[in-house]
A protein has these predicted regions:
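Central hydrophobic cores of alpha-helical transmembrane segments
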Residues: 185-198, 326, 349-361
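Function-determining sites in protein domains
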Residues: 350-357, 367-727
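Terminal transmembrane helical anchor/hairpin motif
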Residues: 4, 40-69, 196-271, 275-288, ...
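Membrane-interface alpha-helices at helix entry/exit sites of multi-pass transporters
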Residues: 111-123
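Long, hydrophobic alpha-helical segments
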Residues: 72-101, 120
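Aromatic- and glycine-rich beta-strand/loop motifs that create alpha-glucan
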Residues: 1-26
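Secretory targeting signals
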Residues: 67, 71-74, 122-182, 186, ...
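Internal/C-terminal transmembrane anchor helices
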Residues: 295-301, 334-376
Length: 727
């Protein structure tokens, strides 16, 4: 009983010393939670009053907003939690920074573990009690205004528990920093290091791999790790995932955080027990931690300095890397020693650690610079590869990627989606392409030792060679994933690409439509230049149509995709995005389905629909621009300029407008739409220096539209070449 009374008495005394923290916490929650809640409710009432009769979904929208505000995704509560955790963590054990106060506290006849528990528990209560009070106030406000339902109540409780867990994580990390240091300023710096160190290391690693390895592929996991290796970033990321309903993933993450919190509490308690009283006022509380922390900071900071100077220099010269390494090494080492000793004269104290850091930095840089582990030329043994996933750059650029499993944040980079959802069980062609990519890497490295990226050309013949990016994920038998990116010439690998493209396993990962359910799609419409029609389909018809389209997509070859122009575009509307898919003339069942529902799937632009074709030679424009640098316009030098004669526009030099049917009939088969070209630009050859603008009549009432086109390579009619002075 005496022990219990002493515990409570010490707890009350500690609370008296921390009244300012309590006031700050209460004020923060009241202003940024309760008051903001009242403001939001007032805004909701105004919206209902002004928009209720016009918007039938306004109440549902307000309900979702209330859930978001009271739930884990409330950004203001997250900020309060972070600030309160840092403040309470740093201020709770403030007496450890004063020798007199340390002697006073440690003279109390109470075990250190109990002193630690008192201060730790008070820091938790300073957060929990104001949060609970203001959560109840928010419940009352919402209830009075008829926004309080069971879902809102449970969402608030979920947020309460979730925020407490991450408060404990951030709070305990700050306490560990205090235990390791003996000065408030150093404690603050140490806390910042602990919060950011993981993200910093992952970022440095990613930057070096990206800078030095030609085949390095940065995927979603890297970006995610940079965020989540910081407890602050992990907090925000997990809050978003809860709102998006990740289920079992969240449970596993929360369990891992709880285990980490328990380990950190045990570690902090151990440090408090072992912390010498004379550590007060010193930079570091434990001598053994000084070199460990010093090396853990100096080495990555030096690497960051080197890559920073190298990146700033346009030449990416290795000399700037070396300069940056040395500069950052000396400066960071000196600053840390000054902090350790509180003496500028000891900036280079412990020269052996400085030399050791320099050696470690040099070894790491040499590993990257000379690829000592053969990262760029490594390829798993084919017998060890379970499946391969690939993403081919410059192909089907119109495809939009979205993962319905990830709710509102499902948007993703196209290669990430394909690599995550594709499993090619017959890896032969994909594996052969990877080997060709490695040979390309070796060729580049043998010619250009100071390479920066895979886009350096090997020889003069390669200047006119078209390359595509080839991203690969090897999934090994042990479930390990290996990612690589290669740049490969089109001409010598086209046959292998055709084999990959026709593989159903490839298409299932390349086209997201294969992963859809009919209920993912709200509506389906179809459009061309002449018509835009939205279909009224039930779930069975939507499912039937999607299956029809996928079946025809299965049989579509790479040759078809890049050489046959589509006749129409399908638009699949979901809750989040609209997705476009092309209808090709060979998709007979798809076209029949569209025709049966009143859309002409065979209607294309014919020469009879074309009002005029305007052609411009960009080379002439470039010559004109070059002349203007010297004060001479092209019109002056050739005495030709755009003018009108009796109201008729005269084409200037390098341009020509064709309106006669004979010319149009000869030009139109030789051009392709600009958007179709850009969708597959790597695999289609066009005359890029010539712009073609086609004016198309879209009805019988003189309404027209204009579209950009390109001439196919080597198919420009002779009379056009003469008319625009094309060389």
């Amino acid at each position: 009983m005496t022990s219990k009374n002493l515990f409570l008495k010490l707890q009350r005394e500690d609370m008296k010393r921390r009244v300012w923290s309590i006031a700050l916490s209460m004020l923060g929650f009241f202003l940024l939670f309760t008051v903001v809640c009242a403001m939001e409710v007032s805004n909701y009432a105004y919206r209902i009053k002004t928009m209720g009769e016009f918007d039938s979904n306004i109440k549902e929208w307000i309900h979702n907003q209330v859930i978001r505000f009271i739930g884990p995704a409330n950004e203001l509560v997250i900020v309060i939690t972070m600030v309160c955790a840092v403040v309470c963590g740093l201020s709770g054990f403030f007496y450890l920074h004063s020798k007199k106060k340390v002697d006073l506290f440690h003279s109390i006849p109470v075990r250190r573990e109990k002193l630690f528990a008192i201060t730790y528990l008070n820091g938790l209560l300073i957060y929990i009690v104001p949060y609970m009070i203001n959560l109840l106030l928010c419940y009352i406000i919402l209830g009075i205004n008829n926004h309080m339902v069971m879902e809102v109540f449970l969402s608030g409780l979920t947020a309460f528990g979730f925020n407490i867990i991450y408060y404990l994580l951030i709070y305990t990390i700050a306490i560990v920093a205090v235990m390791l240091t003996g000065n408030i300023v150093v404690s603050f710096l140490g806390t910042a290091v602990f919060y950011l160190y993981g993200s910093f290391i992952v970022g440095i690693k990613d930057t070096y791999f990206n800078e030095f390895f030609m085949t390095y592929l940065s995927v979603n996991d890297t970006e995610r790790m940079i965020v989540e290796m910081s407890p602050l970033g992990n907090y925000v990321s997990t809050a978003d995932k809860i709102i998006e309903g990740y289920g079992s993933d969240i449970i596993g993450r929360i369990i891992a955080v709880i285990v980490l919190i328990i380990a950190l509490i045990a570690f902090a308690t151990f440090l408090y027990k072992k912390r010498p009283s004379e550590a007060a006022g010193k930079a570091m509380a434990f001598e053994i931690s000084r070199p460990i922390i010093k090396l853990a900071l100096v080495i990555p900071i030096s690497l960051a300095g080197g890559i920073l100077f190298m990146s700033i220099s346009n030449s990416h010269d290795i000399a700037w890397l070396i300069f940056g390494l040395i500069f950052a090494l000396v400066i960071s080492y000196g600053i840390i020693e000054i902090i350790y000793n509180f003496d500028v004269r000891k900036a280079l104290h412990g020269v052996y650690y400085l030399l050791g850091s320099a050696v470690a930095v040099g070894v790491i840089v040499c590993i990257f610079q000379f690829d000592l582990f053969n990262y760029d030329t490594y390829i798993p043994k084919q017998n060890d590869v379970k499946t391969i996933s690939v993403a081919i750059g410059g192909l089907d650029g119109y495809i939009r990627y979205y993962d319905f499993d990830y709710s509102s944040s499902g948007g993703t980079y196209n290669h990430n989606y394909q690599l995550d959802h594709m499993e090619i069980s017959n890896p032969e062609p994909a594996y052969e392409l990877a080997k060709i990519g490695i040979e390309q890497v070796k060729s580049i490295k043998s010619v250009n030792k100071n390479y920066k990226s895979m886009y350096n050309v090997v020889d003069t013949d390669a200047i006119n060679t078209k390359f595509y990016t080839y991203k690969v994920k090897y999934t090994l038998d042990n479930e390990r994933n290996i990612y690589r990116e290669y740049t490969i010439p089109v001409d010598s690998t086209y046959d292998l690409l055709k084999d990959i493209y026709i593989d159903l396993d490839y298409k299932k990962g390349h086209y997201p439509i294969y992963m859809w359910n009919a209920d993912d799609v709200n509506s389906i419409s179809c459009s061309n230049l002449f018509e835009d029609k939205k279909f009224s389909l039930n779930d069975f018809e939507k499912k039937q149509f999607i299956e029809i389209y996928k079946e025809e997509l299965n049989n579509n070859s790479l040759d078809d995709t890049i050489s046959i122009q589509p006749t129409a575009t399908l638009i699949f509307e979901t809750n989040n995005y609209d997705f476009n898919y092309y209808v090709y003339p060979t998709f007979t069942n798809t076209i029949n389905f569209l025709n049966d529902r009143g859309f002409d799937g065979t209607r294309v632009v014919g020469t009879e629909d074309i009002k005029e074709i305007f052609v411009e030679n960009f080379n002439i424009r470039l010559e004109d621009a070059e002349g203007e640098k010297h004060g001479i316009t092209y019109a002056e030098s050739t005495q030709v300029a755009t003018k009108e004669v009796k109201g008729i526009a005269i084409d200037r030099e390098g341009t020509k407008t064709y309106t006669d049917p004979a010319s149009i009939m000869e030009i139109y088969p030789a051009i392709i739409p600009g958007d179709f070209y850009w969708d597959n630009s790597v695999f289609i050859d066009v005359e890029n220096s010539i712009e073609v603008i086609v004016t198309i009549n879209i009805d019988d009432y003189e309404n027209f539209i204009t579209r950009s086109y390109y001439f196919k390579a080597n198919e420009i009619p002779e009379f056009v070449i003469r008319d625009i002075n094309y060389k």
